[in-house]
Structure formats: structure tokens, C-alpha cells
Amino acid sequence: MTKIIGLTGGIGSGKSSIAQHIESLGVPVYITDIEAKKILEIDAVIAKVVALFGEDILDKEKIDKKKIAALVFQDPEKLRKYNNIIHPKVFLHFQNWVKQYENLPLVVKEAAILFESGSYKDCDKIILVTAPKETRIKRVMKRDGVSREAVEQRMAHQWDDEKKKALSDFVIENIDLVKAKESAENIISVLRNQ
């Protein structure tokens, strides 16, 4: 039976870099953020999101993800309602995706909010990617071109690393990407041999 390995970490921790590296090792990786963005292009989903937030969130009949982020990260109730539209669809898509890899020993599900969404319960093992808070803030400001305040707002909606560590099987500290990738290789080797 294929093991589902959860890969998570706070915004700016470098989990996407680690996910790419794991994929280069021949392990299929499901990136929940990418699939969630695809789901946001489905007409029925667009209609539900517009019903929730109004037509101001549209840009040429597509959902403006920056406008959504600005709304949901300021209001926990809006975030909860938004997630209730998106998460069940991502969950179903993942269930179908993983079926094509039933002959493999493991697959990885990369999700920023693996714990917060409760989907960690569906994973056999969990890898947490961490980095110092200040490093994470600087990475996201540079990557997304957003203010420090915007990054801190997003962080406020994620569990802190200590809480995540308590539920994780492996922790990769991503201060030095080369060392973090080596840690990922070692963890994948262990998981393949379990």
C-alpha cells in the first residue's frame, strides 16, 4: 500500500524547494496550492466564491487571488468559509491523484496548512520544513512583493512551528538549502526502507 507522506511548513519555510527536490528523487509530489488554484478556475467554484465575497474579487471573470488573500487573511470567518469551498474539492482531487501511484511505496502531499486543515490525519508520516521567522518573512516579502505586515497576517493564520513539531515525524531546518536537501534525501531513504 502506498504511504502518504505529508510535507508542510509555514509560509516562507522553503517547503516548495524541498518538494521539488523530493520530486527529483523520483517521488510523486502533489502540490495542494497548485491544485487549489486550478479549482478556482472552475465556473461553479467561481460562482460560490463570488457569492461569498462579491464581484469585486473578479478580474476579467477570473478570481483575483491577491484580492482574496487580502480579504481572508484579515477575517478568520471569511477564511473558514473560503476554505470550506476549496478544501473538499482539493481533498477529492488528491484521492483520485493518489490512485495512479498505488504501485509505488510512497507519495508526498505538500500543503502549507496540512495541520490547520486537518488533512495531516490522512498521512502516514509527516515532514515539517522550518526556518527562522525573520528569514521566512524576508523570503516572502522578496518572493511575493508584499509588505512585512501582509506576511505577518498570513503567518498569524498558521500554527507555530513548535505546535507542528509535536505532530511531525521528521523536521528539516531550512537555513542552508544544500543541507536541507540532504536531510530530505535521508528522510526519503528511510521512508522507502520502512
Where are these regions (language model features)?
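Walker A (P-loop) phosphate-binding motif
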Residues: 1-27, 31-34
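A general structural signal for well-ordered alpha-helical segments in protein cores
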Residues: 4, 19, 32, 42, ...
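Hydrophobic "anchor" residues on beta-strands that sit immediately upstream
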Residues: 4, 29, 105-106, 165, ...
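Well-ordered beta-strand positions
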Residues: 28, 34, 125, 169-170
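ATP-dependent small-molecule kinase phosphotransfer cores
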Residues: 34, 38-105
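Short gly/ser/thr-rich secondary-structure transition/capping motifs
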Residues: 88-92, 107-112, 152-157
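ATP-dependent NMP and nucleoside kinases share a basic, alpha-helical "lid"
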Residues: 93-101, 106-143
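Small-molecule kinase domains that catalyze NTP-dependent phosphoryl transfer to phosphate-bearing small molecules
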Residues: 121-122, 133, 142, 146-190
